[in-house]
UniProtKB/Swiss-Prot annotation:
Keywords: Coiled coil, Nucleus. The gene is ARP5. This is Actin-related protein 5. Residues 270-298 have a biased composition (Basic and acidic residues). Its main location: nucleus. It comes from Oryza sativa subsp. japonica.
Amino acid sequence: MSELLFETYGVPSIGNDTYLFVPLLSIVHGSFEVRIVDAKDVSSYFLKGEPVLGACCRTNVGGFHITDFLRQLLSLKYPYHSASITWEKAEELKKEHCYVALDYMSELQIFKNNKEEAEEKTRYWQLPWVPPPVEEPPSEEELARKAALKEKAGQRLRDMAAAKRSQKIAELEKQLSYLEELMEQLDGAEEEEATAILGRSGYLSQQEIKSAILKATQSLRKAKGESNGNEEKADASGVDKYPLVSVPDETLTPEQLKEKKKQILLKTTTEGRMRAKQRRAEEEALREKQEEERRLENPELYLEELRARYSELSDRVDQRKRQKLNGGKTNGNHNSSGGVGRGERLNAAQKERMRLLTSAAFDRGKGEDTFGTRDEDWLVYKKMSKDNDDDDDGNDDDESELARIASKIQDMDPTFVNKAEAVQQTPEPPKVRTLTAEDYRISIGIERFRCPEILFQPGMIGIDQAGIDEMVSISLRRLMEDEAVKERLCQSILVTGGCSLIPGMIPRLESGIRQFRPYLSPLKLVRAADPLIDAWRGAAAFAASSKFGRHTFSLADYREHGENLFHRYNIVYSL
């Protein structure tokens, strides 16, 4: 400190020892001859009358730590408002709202159990908050204007749709007129002339033209909004869809023969699919009937069978999914030793796929093309698929069966949860709540007395020291064994410093000191007249006295003796 004052600030002289014992200056101003408990903003000192340095104690906890502890607690409690909880604001809150509890644990129990009393002791700090703008309901004029704009836009769309419909009707009428005129020409023409007319028109036969006329007529009626009574009958007619199937081959040209083969293939495929669909529907109806009979006969057994079937199918589907994710490594004969040929790494399904691809690539137009006459012919595309596996044939069937069984179980057991639905269920998006003034209100309850408590329990902030009440007893033990002197000192304890202004400080300090004093021993604590500036006024009075010159250390003395002249007291700062 002396080096800082002389070297940096260039002061001419400083008090010999008084700047080390600032609380002593309160006595100079107040004319006391007492023990001093300085609860100032930085540290706390304990002195007895004239300085008895062997009995001095010092704590590292003061008003600064209370303010910083309060700021940290509020910042952790309200992290979104940490920018508003500045050190200066925490200092202001400490001076206005903090107090020292006479019994710390009892005060905590009040906030734990007694809600009404705790609410009375709680203080609130309202941060600046601007309410969101309230949307005013539109006026009648605004509603009328929007309705007019909406009606205008709707009318414009209706006009556009009507114009488009009129254009389509005109095109259909023109097409229908052309087709009817073409049919009139074919009715009165000979065979060679009819063939030439068909070649120019792009149609293959009169049946195809009739089918086109029927479709155009239906489209025209639909565009005009008229009913189509014979639409279903026309759609059901195989002659209209496949006009060349019933025509003899002798009367067809080579191009028409190719088209006839395509129509036969499509017709056969469609009929096969319809038969398979009807067969599956009949089997499904029969199975549903049998299951319903079993359910009515023994519902518990039926439900148990459904659960077992569901578990089996679920495991099978999960296993297939894991195999696909692992690249199908669980299928086929895989050799992990390396150095084998391509054929040795293929399983049976992959070899069959390669054979089909090779056959399709080199078998071009050999013999009569009868592909598609049987339903089984179309399974070749599934076998040729790259994703095909030896277990993939029933994959879709298993998943559909699994969904069906899960639906039946849910009908009988509402508490059942389908695994697929549980996995596919997407989490709900977080709901955004509008912030209110309550969200910008900071509550200060336990913090009011918890922060000043660190003066008596420094361990709360990690400082391994005794509290100021215990330090008084330690200071007394360091004095002489004369009990009369101790009793006289305990009757005039001066409490000074900024922290002594905290409400409840004097009663709590007195209660703590009594615990270390004999029963019914006299004890009196006095707060300084002005704890904040009494020390400064005492220093000013001492500096103005004639004795001040004998207690100063000048710059010349500093340069001659150095700062070691100050190191002559053995004060124990820690306990």
